[in-house]
Regions:
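Positively charged, low-complexity terminal tracts
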Residues: 1-128
Length: 128
């Protein structure tokens, strides 16, 4: 797994194998876990993802600057939706990416969530 924080666009870019995305989806569904990312010399590379169960409402995706990790926290129902989206990306047989962006009234993301781009383990754009 590779996590890069992009200060220019204010988003985090996540690239992972299908197995790593499935592990992340499971941690999100369970509401706990700490997954490491591949180390890199770049100052914008994050060390991993921590998942926490909180009362919500919604899922908050934020960056812990001190520990250089991405934190995903939220209530069970909202985490379940995010986990399903991550699993769908892990099992999709074509390429592409998934934008997870908060907007007012979003049904599972909490206000203040960082935009997250999840890249397909199969690369580029879909072949459909």
């Amino acid at each position: 797994m590779r996590l890069v924080s992009d200060p220019r666009y204010g988003e985090v870019d996540l690239s992972a194998s299908a197995e790593e995305l499935t592990c992340l989806a499971s941690a999100v569904a369970q509401g706990e876990g700490l997954l490491s990312s591949a180390s890199s010399s770049g100052s914008n590379t994050l060390a991993g993802v921590e998942v926490k169960n909180t009362s919500g409402p919604g899922v908050l995706v934020h960056r812990d600057a001190e520990r250089q990790i991405l934190v995903i926290s939220g209530d069970s129902a909202s985490r379940t939706v995010l986990a399903e989206n991550l699993r769908a990306m892990a099992t999709a047989e074509d390429g592409g990416h998934l934008h997870i962006d908060y907007y007012p009234g979003h049904f599972y993301l909490a206000e203040g969530s960082l935009p997250l781009v999840v890249n397909s383990p199969h690369g580029g754009m879909p072949t459909r």
